[in-house]
């Protein structure tokens, strides 16, 4: 696998030397880094409720992380279509450990490396692609929750227009770093259903083959429908409402789930969030998520998450940012609860808007959780912030203080 990846990278780099009349090189990326302490004693420990699929991230991230992306247009053909390649390096390292980006506390990998033939007249402006790429990633910014994500290693047709609608298909074998087995997955999407001025619906279906390499495995499927409303309520932001359902391995919803689950395993999810920029200085994002998991082995659980982040700029470059979030998981063993609050004085040299970056933040985070959450952490996440072997011991509350920089660019 390493040898084939190396050959692919060499071919991609070699293609940059081809004689072409016009080659546009684009460099984009994302970086966050910082340092923090838990209650002023020891390295920062982040708060996430066992069973919750995400956490509220402001002042609650415990890693250095970077994505560095290069995209190169190789040829523009006579029909207007474009041949391109794209590669992205990903770097990750936990706080409190030397940033080697390898070993038990860090990683370095190519999380994108693919070729694309875009704007094809034969596909009415659609594209063909092959490789490993980010694709149709739908996420909530304040919790970094990728609820519908078709990123994968495979090939696909992207947004071929037929009439008023755009059709996409992806065949993939692996859709996340944590997926151990290669499993065939098919994703079909149709978009462009106009519902109202500024509003559209996109629908996607995923089918996951039964893998022959996994004992007692099963096939599965999932469906997602999402409505996107531009300029929601005149607040200069978007609203997204997604409804999701899956069975068997399809219970991963946005991802390939456990292939040993049969069709008796089911998951439902509702995602609702919106951005707003009420004035040039006042903006934010609010979210609500509900997920119900039904398992035949008694592992049923319900997850609720409600929260929001708001920023107010006192000057063109100084913001005060606040975030509050609550997660609750109803499962065997009791109802787990976690509430978290963060306040962050922030320098924003590019302006006062909510999404303007870079930001350099000082932050204070306080969280509180109940006994059921602590007992679940003892069992499922020993040594984590909520467990009695973590940074806060037997207490069921704790705080972090630190500094962080976040920056993205295109």
Task: Show the residue positions of the predicted features.
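Short sequence motifs at beta-strands and strand-loop junctions characteristic
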Residues: 58-64, 104-107, 147-149, 180-182, ...
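Detector for outer-membrane/organellar transmembrane beta-barrel domains
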Residues: 195-210, 216-331, 337-341, 347
């Amino acid at each position: 696998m390493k040898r084939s990846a190396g050959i692919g990278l060499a071919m991609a780099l070699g293609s940059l030397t081809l004689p072409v009349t016009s080659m546009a090189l684009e460099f984009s990326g994302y970086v966050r880094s910082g340092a923090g302490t838990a209650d002023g004693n020891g390295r920062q420990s982040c708060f996430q409720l066992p069973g919750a699929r995400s956490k509220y991230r402001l002042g609650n991230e415990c890693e250095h992380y970077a994505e560095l992306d290069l995209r190169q247009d190789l040829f523009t053909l006579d029909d207007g279509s474009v041949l391109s390649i794209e590669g992205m390096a990903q770097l990750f390292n936990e706080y409190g450990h030397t940033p080697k980006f390898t070993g038990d506390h860090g990683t370095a990998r190519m999380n994108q490396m693919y070729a694309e033939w875009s704007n094809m007249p034969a596909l009415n402006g659609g594209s063909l692609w092959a490789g490993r790429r980010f694709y149709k990633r739908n996420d909530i910014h304040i919790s970094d929750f990728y609820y519908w994500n078709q990123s994968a290693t495979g090939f696909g047709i992207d947004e071929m227009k037929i009439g008023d609608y755009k059709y996409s298909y992806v065949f993939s074998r692996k859709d996340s770093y944590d997926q151990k087995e290669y499993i065939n997955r098919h994703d079909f999407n149709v978009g462009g259903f106009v519902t109202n001025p500024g509003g559209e619906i996109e629908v996607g279906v995923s089918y996951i083959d039964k893998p022959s390499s996994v004992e007692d495995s099963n096939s599965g499927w999932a469906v997602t429908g999402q409505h996107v409303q531009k300029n929601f309520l005149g607040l200069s932001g978007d609203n997204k409402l997604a409804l999701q359902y899956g069975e068997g391995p399809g219970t991963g919803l946005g991802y390939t789930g456990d292939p040993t689950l049969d069709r008796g395993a089911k998951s439902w999810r509702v995602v609702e969030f919106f951005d707003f920029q009420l004035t040039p200085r006042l903006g934010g994002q609010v979210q609500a998520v509900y997920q119900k998991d039904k398992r035949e082995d008694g592992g049923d659980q319900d997850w609720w998450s409600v929260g929001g982040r708001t920023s107010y700029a006192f000057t063109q470059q100084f913001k005060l940012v606040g975030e509050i979030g609550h997660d609750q998981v109803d499962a065997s063993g009791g109802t787990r609860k976690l509430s978290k609050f963060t306040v962050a004085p922030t320098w924003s040299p590019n302006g006062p808007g909510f999404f303007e970056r870079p930001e350099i933040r000082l932050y204070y985070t306080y969280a509180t959780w109940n006994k059921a959450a602590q007992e679940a952490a003892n069992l499922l996440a020993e040594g984590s912030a909520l467990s009695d072997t973590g940074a806060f011991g037997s207490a069921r509350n704790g705080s972090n203080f630190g500094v962080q920089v976040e920056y993205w660019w295109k």
